[in-house]
C-alpha cells in the first residue's frame, strides 16, 4: 500500500469569517472526513492540518487572564495540535471501516537565525476590521497586516528543517494507523530543544514530512480546485499538469497559492514523485488526473 501525505486547507476546519466555536469546527470536519476516510482505505495516510484561527484564539484566551504570564506561542501551537487532532480523530474514527486513527504531537526544527523572525508574515487568529488596527497593536503589541478586505495578526513563519518525530509517524503508518501529525505546521523548536515563538507553514511542513518518510505522493488541499492561469479573468484556465519549473512563477503569487506551489515543487524536485493541488471535495478526481493540478518531473 502506498503512503500519501495530505495537507488540509483551512476551510476543512473553519470557513472564513465563521465564529471560532467547537460546533462550527465539528460541522466543517464532518463534511471533510468522508473523503479522507475513503482515501484511508486505499493508502497509508498521514494528515497535516493548519491552525491559524485556532492558535490565534488560544493566544487571545491566553492574554485574557492577567494573573498569569502569557504562555509562549510554541506551547499554544502544541495546544492547537491536541485540540484539532482530537476533533479530527473523533470524527474520522466514527467513519465505517476505518483503520486506527492516531494524533502525534509533532516537533519541527527551525533555525533561530531564520530571516522570517525579522519580517513576520504568517496570519493567525480571527479577522478584524481595518479600523481596529491601531487599538489592537496598542493593546497587545501585535503586528497586523491586511488579509484581503480584513485585518489579521501576523507572526514569524520560519522554514521547517527537520521533523523530530518522523520515526514515530513512520512506525504508526507501517502498523496501519491513519496519522494526524505536524498539525499547524508542527511545534517550532531550535536545535538546542528550545521552543520558538513562531508558526510554521503547514504546507511546507507537509512537504518536509513527505520527503522524510519517503511518501509516494503529496496532496495539498485548498479552497481553489486547481492552479489557474490568468486567475480572475475571462481567460482563466485550470492547469491539469505541470512541472515545478513551469509552476515557478506561481510560487511568488500573493495569498495561499504561493506557499502551496513552493511546497509541492520542493517535494517533487527532492523525491521525483508526484504531488497534487486541488479541492477536498474532488480529491479522488484530483488523484485520477480528472481535476486539480498534478505536479511531476
Curated annotation (Swiss-Prot):
Q: Which UniProt keywords apply?
A: ATP-binding, Cytoplasm, Kinase, Nucleotide-binding, Transferase
Q: What is its main location?
A: cytoplasm
Q: Tell me its EC number(s), please.
A: 2.7.2.2
Q: Which organism is it from?
A: Escherichia coli (strain K12)
Q: What is this protein called?
A: Carbamate kinase
Induction statement: Cotranscribed with allF, allG and allH genes, which encode the oxamate carbamoyltransferase. Expressed under allantoin degradation conditions.
Top-rank taxon: Bacteria
Q: Write out the GO cellular component annotations.
A: cytosol
**Membrane-traversing stretches:** none
Q: How does activity depend on pH?
A: There is no significant difference at pH 6, 7 and 8.
Record field: temperature dependence: Optimum temperature is 28 degrees Celsius. Activity is twice as high at 28 degrees Celsius than at 37 degrees Celsius.
Tell me the pathway: Nitrogen metabolism; (S)-allantoin degradation
The enzyme's first-digit EC class, named in words, is transferase
Where found in the cell? Cytoplasm
Among the GO molecular function terms of this UniProt record, one is:
carbamate kinase activity
| Record function comment | Kinase involved in the anaerobic nitrogen utilization via the assimilation of allantoin. Catalyzes the transfer of a phosphate group from carbamoyl phosphate to ADP to produce ATP and leave carbamate, which spontaneously hydrolyzes to ammonia and hydrogencarbonate.
Q: GO biological process: what's one of them?
A: arginine deiminase pathway
Catalysis: reaction(s):
hydrogencarbonate + NH4(+) + ATP = carbamoyl phosphate + ADP + H2O + H(+); carbamate + ATP = carbamoyl phosphate + ADP; hydrogencarbonate + NH4(+) = carbamate + H2O + H(+)
Effect of gene disruption? Deletion of the gene does not affect allantoin degradation and causes only a slight increase in metabolic flow into the glyoxylate pathway, probably because carbamoyl phosphate is used to de novo synthesize pyrimidine and arginine.
For this protein, the record's NCBIfam families field holds: arcC, PRK09411.1, PRK12354.1
Family designation:
Belongs to the carbamate kinase family.
The organism's lineage is: Bacteria, Pseudomonadati, Pseudomonadota, Gammaproteobacteria, Enterobacterales
Amino acid at each position: 500500500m502506498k503512503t500519501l501525505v495530505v495537507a488540509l486547507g483551512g476551510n476543512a476546519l473553519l470557513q472564513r469569517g465563521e465564529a471560532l466555536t467547537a460546533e462550527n469546527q465539528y460541522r466543517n470536519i464532518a463534511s471533510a472526513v468522508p473523503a479522507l476516510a475513503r482515501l484511508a482505505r486505499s493508502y497509508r495516510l498521514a494528515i497535516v492540518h493548519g491552525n491559524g484561527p485556532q492558535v490565534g484564539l488560544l493566544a487571545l484566551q491566553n492574554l485574557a487572564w492577567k494573573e498569569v504570564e502569557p504562555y509562549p506561542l510554541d506551547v499554544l501551537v502544541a495546544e492547537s495540535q491536541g485540540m484539532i487532532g482530537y476533533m479530527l480523530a473523533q470524527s474520522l474514527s466514527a467513519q465505517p471501516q476505518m483503520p486506527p486513527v492516531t494524533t502525534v504531537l509533532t516537533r519541527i526544527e527551525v533555525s533561530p537565525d531564520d530571516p522570517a523572525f525579522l519580517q513576520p508574515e504568517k496570519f493567525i487568529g480571527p479577522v478584524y476590521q481595518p479600523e481596529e488596527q491601531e487599538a489592537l497593536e496598542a493593546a497587545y503589541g501585535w503586528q497586523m497586516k491586511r488579509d484581503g478586505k480584513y485585518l489579521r495578526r501576523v507572526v514569524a513563519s520560519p522554514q521547517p528543517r527537520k521533523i523530530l518525530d518522523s520515526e514515530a509517524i513512520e512506525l504508526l503508518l507501517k502498523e496501519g494507523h491513519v496519522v494526524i501529525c505536524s498539525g499547524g505546521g508542527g511545534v517550532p523548536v531550535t536545535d538546542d530543544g528550545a521552543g520558538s515563538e513562531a508558526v510554521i507553514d503547514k504546507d511546507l511542513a507537509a512537504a518536509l514530512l513527505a520527503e522524510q518518510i519517503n511518501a509516494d505522493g503529496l496532496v495539498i488541499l485548498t479552497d481553489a480546485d486547481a492552479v489557474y492561469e490568468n486567475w480572475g479573468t475571462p481567460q482563466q484556465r485550470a492547469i491539469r499538469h505541470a512541472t515545478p519549473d513551469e509552476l515557478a512563477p506561481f510560487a511568488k503569487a500573493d495569498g495561499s497559492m504561493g506557499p502551496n506551489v513552493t511546497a509541492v515543487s520542493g517535494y517533487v524536485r527532492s523525491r521525483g514523485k508526484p504531488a497534487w493541488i486541488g479541492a477536498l471535495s474532488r480529491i479522488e478526481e484530483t488523484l485520477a488526473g480528472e481535476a486539480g493540478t498534478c505536479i511531476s518531473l
